[in-house]
Amino acid sequence: MSCESCLPALSCRTSCSSRPCVPPSCHGCTLPGACNIPANVGNCNWFCEGSFNGNEKETMQFLNDRLASYMEKVRQLERENAELECRIQERNQQQDPLVCPAYQAYFRTIEELQQKILCAKSENARLVVQIDNAKLASDDFRTKYQTELSMRQLVEADINSLRRILDELTLCKSDLEAQVESLREELLCLKKNHEEEVNTLRCQLGDRLNVEVDAAPTVDLNRVLNETRCQYEALVETNRREVEEWFTTQSEELNKQVVSSSEQLQSCQAEIIELRRTVNALEIELQAQHCMRNSLENTLTESEARYSSQLSQVQCLITNVESQLGEIRADLERQNQEYQVLLDVRARLECEINTYRSLLESEDCNLPCNPCATTNASGSCCGPCGSSKRCC
């Protein structure tokens, strides 16, 4: 930035310097800072009425120096700002963007595995139910077998007792038959002895003695034996019938008792089986609930671990972003402070430029617009440029 753009009020004076009344020595020297203002303007006689004093020259020199340093500082800050922007862009390009890892595929795999685990658990529970049903059926068949076995043992015991009774009756019958045979043999012996005695007596007495004896009529032993046999057979038949009736009644009562006890036993066994089924069903349900609770606890633990890991990753990401945001804020704050400093410097420089401009405008107002005409009117010369020369 040059002084000509900052100080447009100097155009009148710079145009006047091109006139021939101004000595050549007045055009060579300029102020520091390339303001194109003649430094020896106070040496000309035509400038004697509106010349600057020493303080104004020092002020203009100071303002030119400040303006030059300000422009240099502005250029330096622009260069530093460009360097910082390049460094920020390089750093952003070098840093890899923080991308959250994709867990969707793992989540799908985990969900598929959880579905498979649930299917396997349901299949396991179904197999456990089938095994328990098979155990219940085997228990039912075992109880039925034990019931039939106990009934068979009872029937075999009854048959054995009846066989013992039959053996006793057979022995009794054989004893009675033996007694009948012994009585028959005894009767035959008695008949034979009686006939022998009668024959001996007849032989002793002969025909000499004929004794008539009023005796009881002879008894038919065969008839008596037959009657006795009939009586014993009737007695045996009666005893057999009574024993058979007693056995039948006892068997019926025993069968009734066995049937009633078997019915009671079957009802009790049915109740026991039903209670066992209920208990097994409740145990199966309890086991299923335990398995479900364990699976839910495992799922909850896995979910907590997964979400805690995700939360830690997100927290790390947030921490990194916050740190970067803090750095960016610090950079922005620093740049804002520098900008505020620059704004303050600019405001001060603008204030100084305005002061400088007001001073120049006041000096321009004090200077005549055509100094050559003024000197012609007064009839004076231009001082050191030559006393015999006129200014126009």
From Swiss-Prot:
<dbReference type="InterPro" id="IPR002957">
    <property type="entry name" value="Keratin_I"/>
</dbReference>
<feature type="region of interest" description="Linker 12">
    <location>
        <begin position="204"/>
        <end position="219"/>
    </location>
</feature>
<feature type="region of interest" description="Head">
    <location>
        <begin position="1"/>
        <end position="56"/>
    </location>
</feature>
<feature type="region of interest" description="Linker 1">
    <location>
        <begin position="92"/>
        <end position="102"/>
    </location>
</feature>
<keyword id="KW-0416">Keratin</keyword>
<feature type="region of interest" description="Tail">
    <location>
        <begin position="364"/>
        <end position="392"/>
    </location>
</feature>
<dbReference type="GO" id="GO:0005882">
    <property type="term" value="C:intermediate filament"/>
</dbReference>
<keyword id="KW-0175">Coiled coil</keyword>
<protein>
    <recommendedName>
        <fullName>Keratin, type I cuticular Ha4</fullName>
    </recommendedName>
</protein>
<feature type="region of interest" description="Coil 1B">
    <location>
        <begin position="103"/>
        <end position="203"/>
    </location>
</feature>
<comment type="similarity">
    <text>Belongs to the intermediate filament family.</text>
</comment>
<feature type="site" description="Stutter">
    <location>
        <position position="275"/>
    </location>
</feature>
<feature type="region of interest" description="Coil 1A">
    <location>
        <begin position="57"/>
        <end position="91"/>
    </location>
</feature>
<feature type="domain" description="IF rod">
    <location>
        <begin position="56"/>
        <end position="367"/>
    </location>
</feature>
<feature type="region of interest" description="Coil 2">
    <location>
        <begin position="220"/>
        <end position="363"/>
    </location>
</feature>
<dbReference type="GO" id="GO:0005198">
    <property type="term" value="F:structural molecule activity"/>
</dbReference>
<dbReference type="InterPro" id="IPR039008">
    <property type="entry name" value="IF_rod_dom"/>
</dbReference>
<keyword id="KW-0403">Intermediate filament</keyword>
<dbReference type="Pfam" id="PF00038">
    <property type="entry name" value="Filament"/>
</dbReference>
<dbReference type="InterPro" id="IPR018039">
    <property type="entry name" value="IF_conserved"/>
</dbReference>
